[in-house]
Amino acid sequence: MRKTHFSIVLFLLLFSFSQAQNNNTKGIPPAIAEKDLTAYLFVYFTGNSVEEEAVRYAISADGYHYYHLNNNKPVIDSKVISSTGGVRDPHILRGDDGKTFYMVLTDMTSSKGWDSNRAMVLLKSTDLVNWKSSIVNIQTAFPGNENLKRVWAPQTIYDAKAGKYLIYFSLQYAGGPDKIYYAYANKDFTGLESAPKLLFVPKSERACIDGDIIEKDGIYHLFYKTETENPGIKVATTTDLTSGKWTENDNYLQQTKDGVEGSSVFKLNNSDDYILMYDVYTKGRYQFTKSKDLENFTVIDNDISMDFNPRHGTILPITRSELKKLITKWGMPDKFPKINNNPVLEGYYADPEILYSNKTKKYYIYPTSDGFDGWSGNYFKTFSSDNLTDWKDEGIIVDLRKDVTWANRNAWAPCIVEKKIKGKYNYFYYFTAAQKIGVASSDNPNGPFTDSGKALVSTRPEGVKGGQEIDPDVFTDPKTGKSYLYWGNGYMAVAELNANMISIKEGSTKIIKVDDTFREGTYVIYRKGTYYFLWSEDDTRSPNYKVRYGTSKSPLGPIEIPKDNIVIQGIPDQGIYATGHNSVLQIPNKDEWYITYHRFSYPTGIKMGDAGGFHREVCMDKLEFNPDGSIKQVIPTHSGIDAIK
């Protein structure tokens, strides 16, 4: 897992652990890592006829080129979710938990008049495909709204201070201008907690509609359309959403003389740039502008393409798995670019172990849970797949704080083996905890796992003066059926496991000599009479972290090291760094092999300094052999592998 001298590592670990204990919110992985936001969903409606007043979807790989889904037909039936038979102005938000989505809509058909609606629609989803909806009629739900004329363009933002979702919208009462109001949604997102309250009224006290709020650096920016003699888009800012204290910017932000409305702002993925777009409704088109400061905007219309004509909508950054769900449901647009399959897991993970289960006929990845400051994670997860490209999070399988009595920190570098004992499949899961190695067992590859109750390896082998007892690898020799445990940072140790797989055969521990490139992460495979020993060189925080190999005629060595023995290393020109700590998968009954490994998270890991070494992601590429049995150097890719059948 890590590659530094033991004394330095121990100091850093203890310091990191102490800091984490003092502040358990520090260095916790986000619900959604920005590096996993790789595409965009555009939610919109198309016009003023009843058929056009419905939610439609489009997708983009880069935020500039958009392709409609479902043949540009509605993805939600307006008649089912609304009181008027039509909906407009869709706004979509990713929830604070990262996995729940909230959409709000104007409940209105324009054919009945611009003052005909009193309601909005609230929707909630966990997959962007299936939505639960509720109608909120302001006039009937809250007394005192008899003079309410219309409810327009609702939107949602998470108010971290209140811990609630704030819905804001414009209301117009008889004899008065449109003003922007707000109310908090109830816990189920099916209604409002209270009657609407004023959120914002411009100094001009003239009408304002189509509010859109985005937070940047602790400041909330409210973009809105003002209905003065010179209508257009302006912005006001505050540090407290509901304080009523807004600072207005008098400048107009639209970059056209044509009439505009329905502004919306989103941040480009893995970028400092923001896009402000708005509906040029008098010309039937959209305009896109770009900014870094949310004050100065440049038109980028020449960079934008769409194969549809949207009206007022919003754009949501989405992950690859979310994109795939949309495509599975509504099809892949003909011109949409090929989707990369690396990294194979979303989120921060490292030290991947991969297994094919003969019991379930599925593939499993067992990684280190990464993204914690100083490698301070304390639980392990597993992920399953039928095709090696689409992975399901199976949840936590070992939590050191709950499931292990002998250690509660630094959950690192697991490995697993499937053994058939007395006709039943058993799974033995070896893991590092607090620089010791333990083992847990289960009847299923996704658990639950039961810890053995004590560390399997807790001290250095005899004669070893430095390093750490980490990075276990388990290998069953197909020639003898014996199973071996390998481990070590700074040294490579091996011991034969007893038949129970949870204890080491007495007197079997030995040190295998490797060259100076060995640091950690031993992995052993067998192919056509040859044992291949793979290991990682350098420090996991180093951009030069890589995998090398040697061969042997025995699982106990000695190891012969080829002249050109790099298995995989980074490609700086492609932003790929620190490709290491691997495992290898052989497709059952085939001479077909794949290597899983971690790398710095792309594209920002290389900019993180040492933190890049605990913000890693898991990738997979094909592993091939030359005719003489030597390993071809793997070229790491962003595209990854194609799904297997």
Segments the model singles out, each with a brief description of its role:
Residues 1-26:
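Bacterial Sec-dependent N-terminal signal peptides
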Residues 22-645:
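Carbohydrate-active catalytic/glycan-binding domains of CAZyme proteins
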